[in-house]
Amino acid sequence: MKMHPIISLIILSVGFSQQLPKVVETYKNGNIRNITFHKETQTGIEKDKYEAYHYTGRKASEGTYLNGKEDGLWTYWYENGQKRWEGTVKNGQRNGLWTYWHENGQKGSEVTYTDRKEGGLQTKFHLDKECWNEDGNVCECGQYWWEGCK
């Protein structure tokens, strides 16, 4: 009969072991600098998710981990709250389409990464939409700066 409390204790400890504490670092002003979430795996404890914050408290970045390496969607923000860049990471390396924005929120470029290198389609967006015709006069740009005047 004494075995039941021991078995209950083991079952309780295994059941609660999935809820691992998050690690929180703060700035001197008390605001959160970053939060690292962990999970228990067959090989031990490893990072699961990461969030970083600007000194002011706004979110700076977030992403996920797999097998201890960055993996999945990663997003970064400017301090004003606008997206800075976003894309997918696989096994710790950029992979697939990454989108970059200017601080004012306008899209700056799209780059496709293959085998850890920029490759494939790359699209750059003109920030101020100022184009010139053959005579040197300013005109309204097409959708992309390289299209020239409308």
Task: Enumerate the predicted regions with their spans.
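Sec-dependent signal peptide recognition
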Residues: 2-9
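Absolute protein N-terminus
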Residues: 1-2, 18
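Hydrophobic h-region of N-terminal signal peptides that target proteins for export
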Residues: 9-17
